[in-house]
């Protein structure tokens, strides 16, 4: 399983140029820099941006539970207390490049918990297993649509 994930990430990395073009409106260099800084896959970040906001840096969404998702990566307001310790406010979340860096940080936290797995990718959205698994499959579907992953067998 881990070897398959590593092979998939290598294939995804080789095809980076295609995704770079697909995610251009969200400052591609921010994705690359944030991913490098947090040691996460930039293509996964780009797919998350597409899933979350279709690369709209001004996106905001009020959830049924009263929380709010902010920016291109739809960072949830439940993270604001932790982010405030680093001087990050709600307004900061609406700055596209900073939003991507915060998303990379959040994804890294999930990878530290779950490893370099699809569970970690899904946990970016939710740690509830059914929601986590559904989300990771949505990210896989985006990568397949961008021809960055092989079709399901």
What residue ranges belong to the model's regions?
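Bacterial N-terminal signal peptides that target proteins for export
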Residues: 3-13
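N-terminal signal peptide c-region/cleavage motif recognized by signal peptidases
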Residues: 22-25
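Catalytic glycan-binding domains that act on GlcNAc-containing polysaccharides
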Residues: 27-153
């Amino acid at each position: 399983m881990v070897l398959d994930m590593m092979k998939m990430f290598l294939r995804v990395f080789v095809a980076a140029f295609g995704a770079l073009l697909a995610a251009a409106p969200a400052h591609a260099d921010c994705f690359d820099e944030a991913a490098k800084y947090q040691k996460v896959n930039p293509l996964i970040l780009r797919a998350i941006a597409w899933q979350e906001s279709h690369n709209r840096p001004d996106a905001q969404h009020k959830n049924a539970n009263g929380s709010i998702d902010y920016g291109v990566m739809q960072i949830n307001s439940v993270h604001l207390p932790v982010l405030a310790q680093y001087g990050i406010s709600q307004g900061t979340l609406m700055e596209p490049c900073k939003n991507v860096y915060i998303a990379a940080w959040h994804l890294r936290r999930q990878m530290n918990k779950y490893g370099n797995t699809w569970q970690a990718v899904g946990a970016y959205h939710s740690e509830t297993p059914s929601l986590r698994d559904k989300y990771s499959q949505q990210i896989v579907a985006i990568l397949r649509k961008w021809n960055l992953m092989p079709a399901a067998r």
